[in-house]
Structures are given as structure tokens and as C-alpha cells.
Amino acid sequence: MKNKNVIQKMREKTPLIHCITNYVTINDCANILLSFGASPAMCEAYDEVYDFVSISSALYINLGTLTKEQETAAVLASISAKNHNVPVVIDPVGCPAIKRKVEVINRIAEVGRIDIIKGNIGEIKFLAGMDSETRGVDSLDNGENALDACTQLAKKYNCIVAATGEKDFVSDGKRGSVIKNGTEMLTKVTGAGCMLGALCAATCANFEDKLVSTTAAILSMNIAGEKAYEEAQLPGSFRIALIDNIYMISDEEIWERGNVEWK
């Protein structure tokens, strides 16, 4: 896997990532995409999304603060993505607490397309029909059976599924990876998960093996987080250091420093 130049290929293309995301972390997602080497566009008007998806490299749908207007725009955007062969990443933020979000995911799967679902372990286990522990948008789950949950959900939606926590798990229904990098400080800043979803969209835009591209995105965030914590131990300065280290991250670094178990 060390020969997979996921980040290099992404930066060579500067993919346009169309984001329909939440209002809490929209700026964070835009900035981390820019630092990573992608080009963000935060377009969510219903009358604009169909055309804009057609010129985009990937579509990132984050359900964090889902308004009715965002819901209708996201569904239409997913239809355009299906029609124009644009990969779609969905982050089901808070779905155990707000069941309507599951209906939106199922609607997108029905009329559009889903290439990657990226959530925390509690969200992914909930979507897979397993018992999970969550509080609002946060997971309290210990990660037991997380890879099984990813595998089941990947088979259900025929996509890549990533579950993040103390360890991170990725599956395409047959293959999988377990990632053991990261720092607890990533849980002390708002939007780390949302930013990771944006990175997953960037890496999958021009890379065929989306299990590998998703693993690379998670490694990028986790290792940048580790390095940021070496430089800054307080949340405000850590956030800045995280963006800086994403800017400097490379394929060589993530595969050399990455602690990944392939399944």
C-alpha cells in the first residue's frame, strides 16, 4: 500500500469538491480542503446544485444541521452525481438522535448514489442496526464490532463505510482496514469529523480504489493531528497547527508513519 500515491494524484488534479454541509463547520471544511490541495465550493441553493455537481470532482453531503432546503438540495445533487458519474460522500451526523436523517440517506441511495459513508462508530453501528452508544452528535461507543458494522453497512449500500473513534475502521464489504493513529485532541475541536469527511471526498475524487483513498484520508487527518499536538497542546492553537500540518502531509509520511492493519 505504500506505493499508493493518493495525495499526490489528488493534488495534481486540484479536485473541485462540492460541499453541502452544516453551518457549524462549513468554514473549517473549506479551509482544510484548501490546505489539502483541493478546491472547495459550498453551494447549496436548490436551483444551482444540479448544474454545479456536473462540473465537480466529488460531492460531500454532511447532515449535521440539516434544513429542509438542504435536504431537497442534497437529494437533487445526488441525482446529478449519479447522472454525471461524480462520487458522493455522506456524513450522517447525529443520525441516532434524529431518525429523519436515515430517511434522507435512504432517499439518496434510492435516487442518487453513495460511494462513501463516513461517521463515528456510534452512527455507523446505528445505521447497521446494531446497539450503539451516542450522545447528540458524539459517539460514546467503545468500538466493539465496529468493523463488522462497517462491513454490513457497506454491503447494504454497496459503498465504502468508515467508522471513526479511538481506532478507525474502513470496509468495502469484503476488504477492510483498521487505523490506530490519531490524538484525543481531535475530539476537543469542533468539526474534526466534518473536516475528515471533506478529505474523504478529496481523496476519492480521482482515485479508483476508494477503500485505499478513504484510509489515506483518515491517515492524513490522524497523522496531521499527531504532529499538530506535538506543536500545540491547547485547542485553539491545535486547530491552527492541524490545518498547517494537513498542508504539509504527504503520501510517504502517511504510509510510513501510519499504523494500519489491512483485513
Swiss-Prot record:
<dbReference type="GO" id="GO:0009228">
    <property type="term" value="P:thiamine biosynthetic process"/>
</dbReference>
<keyword id="KW-0784">Thiamine biosynthesis</keyword>
<feature type="binding site">
    <location>
        <position position="191"/>
    </location>
    <ligand>
        <name>substrate</name>
    </ligand>
</feature>
<keyword id="KW-0808">Transferase</keyword>
<comment type="similarity">
    <text>Belongs to the Thz kinase family.</text>
</comment>
<dbReference type="Pfam" id="PF02110">
    <property type="entry name" value="HK"/>
</dbReference>
<feature type="binding site">
    <location>
        <position position="164"/>
    </location>
    <ligand>
        <name>ATP</name>
    </ligand>
</feature>
<protein>
    <recommendedName>
        <fullName>Hydroxyethylthiazole kinase 1</fullName>
        <ecNumber>2.7.1.50</ecNumber>
    </recommendedName>
</protein>
<comment type="function">
    <text>Catalyzes the phosphorylation of the hydroxyl group of 4-methyl-5-beta-hydroxyethylthiazole (THZ).</text>
</comment>
<dbReference type="GO" id="GO:0004417">
    <property type="term" value="F:hydroxyethylthiazole kinase activity"/>
</dbReference>
<comment type="pathway">
    <text>Cofactor biosynthesis; thiamine diphosphate biosynthesis; 4-methyl-5-(2-phosphoethyl)-thiazole from 5-(2-hydroxyethyl)-4-methylthiazole: step 1/1.</text>
</comment>
<dbReference type="GO" id="GO:0009229">
    <property type="term" value="P:thiamine diphosphate biosynthetic process"/>
</dbReference>
<dbReference type="GO" id="GO:0000287">
    <property type="term" value="F:magnesium ion binding"/>
</dbReference>
<dbReference type="GO" id="GO:0005524">
    <property type="term" value="F:ATP binding"/>
</dbReference>
<keyword id="KW-0460">Magnesium</keyword>
<keyword id="KW-0067">ATP-binding</keyword>
<dbReference type="InterPro" id="IPR000417">
    <property type="entry name" value="Hyethyz_kinase"/>
</dbReference>
<feature type="binding site">
    <location>
        <position position="118"/>
    </location>
    <ligand>
        <name>ATP</name>
    </ligand>
</feature>
<feature type="binding site">
    <location>
        <position position="42"/>
    </location>
    <ligand>
        <name>substrate</name>
    </ligand>
</feature>
<keyword id="KW-0547">Nucleotide-binding</keyword>
<keyword id="KW-0479">Metal-binding</keyword>
<dbReference type="InterPro" id="IPR029056">
    <property type="entry name" value="Ribokinase-like"/>
</dbReference>
<keyword id="KW-0418">Kinase</keyword>
